[in-house]
Amino acid sequence: MSQVPRLTVGLAVYNGENFLAESLEALLGQSYEDFELVISDNASTDGSADICHRYAKRDSRIRYFRQPRNIGSAPNHNFVIHQARGELFKTAAHDDLYGRELLELCVAALDDDPGIVLAHSWSAVIDENAEVTKVVDYPVNTAAPEATERFRSMLFDGWGDDEGGVVRTDVLRRGALHGSYHFADRTFTIELALHGPFFMVPDYLYFRRYHSGQAGKISNIRRRCANLDPRRANRLANPVARLYAEYIWGYVSAIRRAPLSAAEKGHCYRVLARWIAGRAAPVTSRTLTRSGLSGEETFAPPPREISVDAVVARGERRVQ
């Protein structure tokens, strides 16, 4: 690794001992080695800290931080972004797995085309035992040269796992970071797309894990937002209508900040208005679910047998 690493991998974790070691093995076993791994432990109460300390002693690329209290998922994610020293940045999760060549191929794609702002790969879903159960379709036209088309497609055509791609850090810091409202990951990713096209490595190198304990399974908007930031737990200060309005305002703010012409911004505002009109419904904590107000993810059976062990560096396995 160079004195100042070219890439920062940021991993925010809270009580992740069940899959954390697996994820660290996959990240530290990457064929691309010029990166630092910034871990922010959100005051975990399980064995996460011990795992992080053990790996930090073995690999100097790890910078481990522990929050004195639970600051919430969103501020914890933003903390690792603020700590980044690399010109490139990738968000990692404690329970996901990564093919050995993921970072190498994403960095190469960004080097080959300075106009691209983010590179990722095709993704598949794995279970608790790291077996592939389905693949994530990617019908989104994030490679379009026109920002207006990328914006339209991300609102109407579906969704993927772009927020976990390798992105140019300067672009990342031009916009808003992770908000503490429902779907903040989507406004975050769409803002990146307004700055430039994405590139998808045509291979399954990212494995998103579905398991019973993950925060993404929280369906109630109030509970989800309180997980993102404990200050959201106050029901009176954070009615559902406000959380929904913040979500919509996230898109408006992204358009306002984007490096677009007045005509392009006007086009995006009209697309957003059409999208909102098509989804107008009474907003309650039940209706504002993961797929209720944004392009839905679609899945398919694996087109071929995909072996996680064949492409992912594996060492320690999950804590049972």
What are these regions (language model features)?
Residues Q67-A84, L97:
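Glycine-rich, basic loop-to-helix element that forms the pyrophosphate-binding segment
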Residues F89:
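Short aromatic/hydrophobic "clamp" motif used to bind/position activated sugar donors
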